[in-house]
Amino acid sequence: MGFGRSEDRVDVGTVAPHFTLPSQSGEMVSLEDFLGRKPVVLYFYPKDDTPGCKREACAFRDDYEQFGGLDAEVVGISSDSVESHRSFAENHDLPFTLLSDEGGKVRQLYGVPNTLGLFPGRVTYVIDREGVVRHVISSQLAASRHVEEALEALRAIG
């Protein structure tokens, strides 16, 4: 199984792979913590405090009330450390969970591709209450598009 090949990617209609990772507070968080209760917007991003990632995180922050109004949980994942996530969340007042995937095992599990073969990709999954992937957004450069499309997908699945 190759890393990030299209045939390895989690796609619409498939059950989202389960995982457990440490959050910015050091607490272990599992996808199962949300399933059965609320949909999850799971967004993979390249790196804390880079311009595009900061824009994307702040866009999720700015629309966080809309996600809450749709009873959805936003969760960000990158390979940065717990400490890096803590600082990133505090510096930008991020109200949602950031998970540390050091080593990239969950990124690989989801088949998130690298951009130009070098940089971790930017992919967002909208996962319904039952754990089924309902929408996938993949755009390295249009970070704010992830937020807009995730909200549209959540509205569509009700």
Task: Provide a role label for each language-model segment.
Residues 1-158:
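Chalcogenol-based redox active-site neighborhoods
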